[in-house]
Swiss-Prot record:
<keyword id="KW-0963">Cytoplasm</keyword>
<feature type="domain" description="BPL/LPL catalytic">
    <location>
        <begin position="28"/>
        <end position="199"/>
    </location>
</feature>
<comment type="similarity">
    <text>Belongs to the LipB family.</text>
</comment>
<comment type="function">
    <text>Catalyzes the transfer of endogenously produced octanoic acid from octanoyl-acyl-carrier-protein onto the lipoyl domains of lipoate-dependent enzymes. Lipoyl-ACP can also act as a substrate although octanoyl-ACP is likely to be the physiological substrate.</text>
</comment>
<feature type="binding site">
    <location>
        <begin position="143"/>
        <end position="145"/>
    </location>
    <ligand>
        <name>substrate</name>
    </ligand>
</feature>
<dbReference type="InterPro" id="IPR045864">
    <property type="entry name" value="aa-tRNA-synth_II/BPL/LPL"/>
</dbReference>
<dbReference type="GO" id="GO:0033819">
    <property type="term" value="F:lipoyl(octanoyl) transferase activity"/>
</dbReference>
<keyword id="KW-0012">Acyltransferase</keyword>
<dbReference type="Pfam" id="PF21948">
    <property type="entry name" value="LplA-B_cat"/>
</dbReference>
<keyword id="KW-0808">Transferase</keyword>
<dbReference type="InterPro" id="IPR000544">
    <property type="entry name" value="Octanoyltransferase"/>
</dbReference>
<feature type="site" description="Lowers pKa of active site Cys">
    <location>
        <position position="127"/>
    </location>
</feature>
<comment type="pathway">
    <text>Protein modification; protein lipoylation via endogenous pathway; protein N(6)-(lipoyl)lysine from octanoyl-[acyl-carrier-protein]: step 1/2.</text>
</comment>
<protein>
    <recommendedName>
        <fullName>Probable octanoyltransferase</fullName>
        <ecNumber>2.3.1.181</ecNumber>
    </recommendedName>
</protein>
<dbReference type="GO" id="GO:0005737">
    <property type="term" value="C:cytoplasm"/>
</dbReference>
<dbReference type="GO" id="GO:0036211">
    <property type="term" value="P:protein modification process"/>
</dbReference>
<feature type="binding site">
    <location>
        <begin position="66"/>
        <end position="73"/>
    </location>
    <ligand>
        <name>substrate</name>
    </ligand>
</feature>
Length: 224
């Protein structure tokens, strides 16, 4: 699985690249790839989510294809978007993502795990990583966001995945110093290994046709 760090991005920009690569993987034009990024402030709401879980409309809000509810992305958060042709049951794939995050956090001395009845990765009763996946044409995309240095108070804009914002925690809050890029790339590497794939760092995206589709933010009136 190729792994590409694309730096800090606007969400719609990263989404379009992800969609283009998804189409290319589905058509056999390129192989499995994981994009690693850090977003400018944004809220996304999954296909089963509710807009009333968005509390504060001061950043762009997008409705997207992934599962899950509302989540916030921003600086200080490592986001990994694996674009992978599925040859495993979906549950096995999502478990592999969680396991990759748990093992990555373990290298920093953080004891993380899973929580019965909830997806994502947890430290006790606090959530440190959120997962949302979409599958089309048997190719999975979207992925996982790991809170590295992000201030958990940023999540007060939403009820994250229907949970109170106070549920969220970061590596920094746990006293761990880490770089967003390093955490994201290590997670992608560990995911490749969990899936029996060979991780390969690349410096630029494969040349594939770009989708014409553009993601537009939700437009609502904001009360003063």
């Amino acid at each position: 699985m190729k792994i590409l760090w694309i730096g800090r991005t606007q969400y719609a920009e990263a989404w379009r690249l992800m969609k283009s690569l998804h189409c290319a993987v589905a058509q056999g034009l390129t192989g499995d790839i994981a994009l690693v990024t850090e977003h400018e402030p944004v809220v996304t709401v999954g296909k089963h989510g509710r807009l009333n879980n968005v509390i504060k409309w001061d950043v762009p809000v997008y409705l997207v294809e992934r599962g899950g509810d509302a989540t916030y992305h921003g600086p200080g958060q490592a986001v990994v978007y694996p674009i992978v042709a599925l040859r495993w049951p979906l549950k096995r794939y999502i478990d592999a993502i969680e396991d990759a995050v748990i093992k990555t956090l373990g290298t920093y001395g953080i004891l993380a795990g899973k929580k019965q009845g909830h997806r994502g990765v947890w430290v006790g009763d606090r959530k440190i990583a959120s997962i949302g996946i979409a599958v089309e044409n048997n190719v999975a995309y979207h992925g996982v966001a790991i809170n590295v240095t992000i201030d958990p108070r940023e999540f007060a804009r939403i009820n994250p995945c229907g949970l109170p914002a106070s549920t969220m925690i970061s590596m920094k809050e746990l006293g761990v110093v880490a770089e967003v890029r390093d955490v994201g790339i290590e997670t992608a590497k560990k995911l490749a290994l969990e899936l029996g794939l060979t991780p390969e760092l690349i410096s630029k995206p494969p040349e594939v046709p770009q989708v014409a589709e553009e993601l537009k933010p939700v437009r609502v009136a904001i009360n003063a």
